[in-house]
């Protein structure tokens, strides 16, 4: 799957790319991308932080994390998210339709956002209920202020926690209202649904993943005073409050 992703962005010579290999031996030939091979499996949070640190050190103002089971359909995707950020003031967005979470629970179903907000200059934002970390956009400013992903999380709720921290500081839309391009599916798609492509939720690793999830769930609660979901989860916001927030951050 990685080679298909790389093929879909290989002509973007104006971008800084880094590949973090946190798995088995990886052979990447024919691409002008820097590859970092972890000496041991570090997990999601630490590996993504290596990518974020590299891009910040390269003075990138707009940063994207892309997991290897995604496919770029239109390589102008980066410009589209940057344009939307500048039009809306939202400095952290994510592709919402990897897996079933924002498709009414239906794998490979149709997008089902909670709300679509239209702006001028042909920009529209979809607001989704669930936080999905397969393709994420950040401004440099947001990362320098909030910091990187909390490495106490182990392959569960790491990106959710980070996105929540960004939301608490006003760089992202509120929890349960995660922002994406309204037409993001014109630019990107999943090669396989998250349940099929995950390397941390295989049959052999399922028990380990459950243990990590429970520990990360408890750590999330100790950190924020609420859980990532459930009866004592992060409180939802009303649509009116979300719209008021969007007005306050609009440039």
Show which residues each predicted segment covers.
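Glycine-rich, basic loop-to-helix element that forms the pyrophosphate-binding segment
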Residues: 39-55
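Short beta-strand-to-loop element that shapes/binds the nucleotide-sugar donor at the catalytic cleft/hinge
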Residues: 93-108
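A recurrent flexible, glycine/aromatic-enriched loop bordering the glycosyltransferase active site
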Residues: 118-138
């Amino acid at each position: 799957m990685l080679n298909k992703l790389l093929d879909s962005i290989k002509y973007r010579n104006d971008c800084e790319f880094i590949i973090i290999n946190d798995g088995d031996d990886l052979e990447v030939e024919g691409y002008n991308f820097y590859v970092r091979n972890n000496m041991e499996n570090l997990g999601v949070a630490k590996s993504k932080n290596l990518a974020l640190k590299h891009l910040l050190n390269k003075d990138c103002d707009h940063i994207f994390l892309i997991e290897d089971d995604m496919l770029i359909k239109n390589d102008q995707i980066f410009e589209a998210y940057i344009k939307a950020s500048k039009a809306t003031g939202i400095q952290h967005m994510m592709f919402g339709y990897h897996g079933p979470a924002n498709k009414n629970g239906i794998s490979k179903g149709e997008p089902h956002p909670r709300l679509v907000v239209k702006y001028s200059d042909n920009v529209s934002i979809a607001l989704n209920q669930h936080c999905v970390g397969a393709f994420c956009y950040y401004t440099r400013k947001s990362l320098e202020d909030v910091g990187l992903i909390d490495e106490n999380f182990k392959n569960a709720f790491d990106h959710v926690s980070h996105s929540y921290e960004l939301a608490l500081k006003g760089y992202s839309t509120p929890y349960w209202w995660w922002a994406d391009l309204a037409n993001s599916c014109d630019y990107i798609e999943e090669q396989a649904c998250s349940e099929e492509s995950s390397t941390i939720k295989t049959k052999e690793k399922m028990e380990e993943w459950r243990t990590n999830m429970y520990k990360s769930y408890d750590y999330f609660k100790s950190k924020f005073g609420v859980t990532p979901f459930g009866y004592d989860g992060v409180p939802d916001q009303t649509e009116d409050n979300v719209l008021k927030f969007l007005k306050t951050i609009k440039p």
